[in-house]
């Protein structure tokens, strides 16, 4: 699947644990246009074709440009840098490690197309 050239480093793929389901999640480290992290949900449609949709966006955190490395000064923000995702064994929760922010996020993915 091609998420688009701005989505760099799709590091983690996590399929549903339920063997009757044909969906999962992919964590993307950074969007080069705005420093957001992203999670895409992927699934097989009725015709057997694999599809994907961005379902979670994690915004960068604003920061003083003087505190940032040169590469990030123009953005004025710290990117979340999604480095790992894990799906709970009951397929209910997705855990997302945001290394750049030093945070772990939890999303309810009971409805994989509409995480909360």
Feature names for model-found ranges:
Residues 40-60, 106-116:
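Short loop/turn segments immediately following beta-strands, especially the blade-tip
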């Amino acid at each position: 699947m091609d998420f688009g050239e701005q989505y760099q480093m799709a590091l983690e793929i996590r399929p549903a644990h339920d063997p009757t389901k044909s969906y999962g999640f992919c964590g993307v480290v950074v969007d080069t246009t705005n420093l957001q992290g992203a999670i895409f949900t992927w699934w097989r449609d009725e015709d057997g074709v694999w599809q994907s949709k961005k379902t979670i966006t994690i915004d960068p955190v604003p920061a003083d440009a003087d505190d940032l490395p040169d590469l990030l000064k123009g953005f004025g923000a710290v990117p979340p840098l999604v480095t790992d995702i894990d799906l709970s064994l009951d397929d209910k929760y997705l855990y997302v490690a945001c290394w750049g922010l030093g945070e772990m996020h939890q999303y309810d993915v009971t409805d994989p197309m509409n995480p909360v």
